[in-house]
Amino acid sequence: MSTLGAFSMWDLFRGEVESQMKLFTEGLLALEAGEPPAAHLASAMRAAHSIKGAARIVQLDVGVRLAHVMEDCLVGAQEAGLILTGAGIDVLLAAGDLLSRLS
């Protein structure tokens, strides 16, 4: 049996959420610190997108919906000029914390 075979899908989901949440959080904290947004928005959006896909695989519908809303907020900031304030970033970070707890 391969090492990967010893893990359940939930174990893999948990690991994916953990690694992607690091990228998501780093991106949002960089935005909050006033760093140029383009790369950080893209990184955080990709992380939310990856979590959405992982949640879909384990059929965690609430996780899919939450990650989708997070992704939409970041795409809005990228493409439509939505400005993420400190309060908005805090909400996204709280949503990320919730996804971590769901995993």
What kind of region is each of these model predictions?
Residues 1-103:
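N-terminal assembly/transducer modules of large multi-domain enzymes
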